[in-house]
Amino acid sequence: ILGSGDIGLIMARRMTLEGAHVKVVAELMPYSGGLKRNIVQCLNDYDIPLKLSHTVVDIHGKERVTGITLAKVDEKGKPIPGTEEEYACDTLLLSCGLIPENELSRELGVKLNPVTSGPVVDESLETNVPGVFACGNVLHVHDLVDFVSEEADRAGTCAARYILQENQSSNPGIDQESQYSDSDIGKASKMNDNNDPVIPLISTGCVRYTVPSAIHLSKMPDKLKVRFRVGKVVKNCAVDVYCNEENSEKRIKTKKRPVVAPGEMEEILLGREELLKYPDLQQLIITVKEG
């Protein structure tokens, strides 16, 4: 199996349970892209080896696969000559990442994040196209369905309120009960509303992206959960949020973490009141630092 994300790890276990002999899981990166518990439950528990910093450099066979050649890669991901290993096998599974399906979004003119390949959204999960909201794996790839359900509830609530606002309707039937109250969500916002400045969230260091990508302070809930992923494993670190620049005097919030890894989504909770303490706020910088 090439690829050690959660799908690759789970497929290693499933193939084993179905009677196949999984010889090895190879991963191009120097770390697994899956949850730690999946490495333990899907590989370690079944004595399936995981080779990090390895990739497939050759596939053997004509009518069907008869074997593959693995090689170690350097820090740039290029195969290192002389490190080749041959494995006799009849199947090669490729689990090399997920890309959100966003053809419809492109047709609508929705702006996409080049890192996630998903829409750029604000605190209401609304895109740059008014009335178009995004959540779940079409927005960014999730670890757990619980997070998808939470986002879906929030996006649905905001979309319903947007419709009510647009129709100037007071029909309460469309606004179903939700864990997000009126005070939490506020009115559905538009990222292109010139009367309400947009505060962008800037990812620096090993932080690859954030969801949301921007917020409107006037429409932000009392507490806003910002989710993000990192690009490498960092131990004994802190997630820092800054106002405008990375300066200790401008640090809004910090959150200690024993370790962060690309395979596990991180989050930090931002309070509206703590942001309002910075009247000169023009952008929020989110970074992860060791120590």
Regions found by a protein language model. Give the residues of each.
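A short alpha-helix-loop-beta-strand transition element characteristic
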Residues: 21-22, 111-114, 167
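Rossmann-like nucleotide/phosphate-binding core characteristic of flavoprotein oxidoreductases
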Residues: 161-291
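Ferredoxin-type iron-sulfur electron-transfer modules and their immediate structural context
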Residues: 59, 98-100, 126, 179, ...
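General structural feature for long, well-ordered alpha-helical segments within catalytic domains
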Residues: 7, 11, 21, 35-39, ...
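A conserved FAD-binding loop/helix module that cradles the flavin
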Residues: 135-163
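A Rossmann-like FAD-binding core segment of flavoenzymes
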Residues: 9, 14-103, 222-258
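FAD-site-proximal beta/loop scaffold in flavoenzymes
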Residues: 90-142
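Glycine-rich Rossmann-fold phosphate-binding loop(s) that bind the pyrophosphate
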Residues: 3-4
